[in-house]
């Protein structure tokens, strides 16, 4: 079982999209790489905590490779947009790939470099080791499964 943490704007849609991928074993939304401890959703939105809304993904590398997973992730974000995805604006909506296994870094950078060839603008998706992670409140978990008509900036159909 492998783990990767992906930020692509509002985590509700990112989690729903990723949870539908064959080989993804589990997903959880949370807050990553910020400046405080135990942030709440309100903290993320109103204070300068610098956390990103993220989806923690556990996947079976025998079914889907990191390269394949990232290829799918790139399709749901605008990697050239800084601190904004869809109608959501703020540093918490930045795009990022946060790794826990240093051996994943080369594959992540290769994926980003390959994608850059398709864009004239610079890709601003950050690639960093996971520094800290806090699970989001329960009402955010599987939000679009519980609220099928809830807000989502990603086309899921």
UniProtKB/Swiss-Prot annotation:
Annotated signal sequence range: none
Coiled coil feature spans: none
EC number of the protein: 1.8.4.11
Active site: residue positions: 10
Enzyme class: oxidoreductase
GO biological process, one term: protein modification process
Gene Ontology MF term list: L-methionine-(S)-S-oxide reductase activity; peptide-methionine (S)-S-oxide reductase activity
Any one of the GO CC terms: cytoplasm
Keyword Transferase on entry: no
Keyword terms of this UniProt record: Oxidoreductase
Catalytic activity: L-methionyl-[protein] + [thioredoxin]-disulfide + H2O = L-methionyl-(S)-S-oxide-[protein] + [thioredoxin]-dithiol; [thioredoxin]-disulfide + L-methionine + H2O = L-methionine (S)-S-oxide + [thioredoxin]-dithiol
Keyword Repressor: no
Role played: Has an important function as a repair enzyme for proteins that have been inactivated by oxidation. Catalyzes the reversible oxidation-reduction of methionine sulfoxide in proteins to methionine.
Annotated NCBIfam families: msrA
Family designation: Belongs to the MsrA Met sulfoxide reductase family.
Name used for this protein in its record: Peptide methionine sulfoxide reductase MsrA
Gene responsible for this protein: msrA
């Amino acid at each position: 079982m492998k783990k990767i943490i992906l930020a692509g704007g509002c985590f509700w849609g990112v989690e729903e999209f990723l949870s539908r991928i064959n080989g993804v074993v589990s997903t959880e939304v949370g807050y990553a790489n910020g400046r405080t401890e135990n942030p709440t959703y309100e903290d993320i939105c109103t204070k300068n905590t610098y956390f990103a809304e993220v989806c923690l993904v556990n996947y079976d590398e025998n079914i889907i490779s990191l390269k394949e997973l990232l290829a799918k992730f790139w399709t749901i974000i605008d990697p050239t947009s800084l601190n904004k995805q869809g109608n959501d604006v703020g540093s918490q909506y930045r795009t990022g790939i946060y790794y826990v296994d240093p051996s994943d870094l080369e594959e992540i950078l290769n994926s980003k470099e390959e994608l850059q060839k398709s864009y004239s603008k610079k890709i601003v998706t950050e690639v960093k080791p996971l520094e800290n992670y806090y699970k989001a409140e329960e009402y955010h978990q599987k939000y679009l499964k519980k609220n099928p008509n809830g807000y989502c900036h990603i086309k899921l159909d």
